[in-house]
Amino acid sequence: MHVILKPGKKQDLTPLAFNEKRMNSNETLQLLREHKAELIKRYDVNHLSLFGSTARNQARANSDIDILVSFNGAATSSRYFGLQFYLEDLLGHPIDLVTEKALRIELRPYIEQEAIRV
């Protein structure tokens, strides 16, 4: 979650609460699919996949949402964090964004088995 600071003002840096509604895979996938064209345009996303507790419909209200991403080209900090913040704002939950290149080899088979392509 990101915080916007106003110059010259002392501010409480406690982050705003994320949405406390539990997301299921259908709701999450629908929102991601509705915004897919924008994600491609803004961040040069090649593809996204949902995995983890949300994909298995086992997420709690305070769960993060796990998303596997592949970019066309390099996963620059601007692309990576821009996408992460966009998705957090869109979905109202913390996002654990994992690039395919950064995916640990021992976890790859499990994630690929449960991943749902957007």
Q: Can you annotate each of these PLM segments?
A:
Residues 1-47, 55-61, 72-118:
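Catalytic core of pol beta-like nucleotidyltransferases
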Residues 50:
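Conserved histidines in hydrophobic membrane contexts and catalytic metal-binding motifs
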Residues 68-70:
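Short hydrophobic/aromatic beta-strand micro-patches
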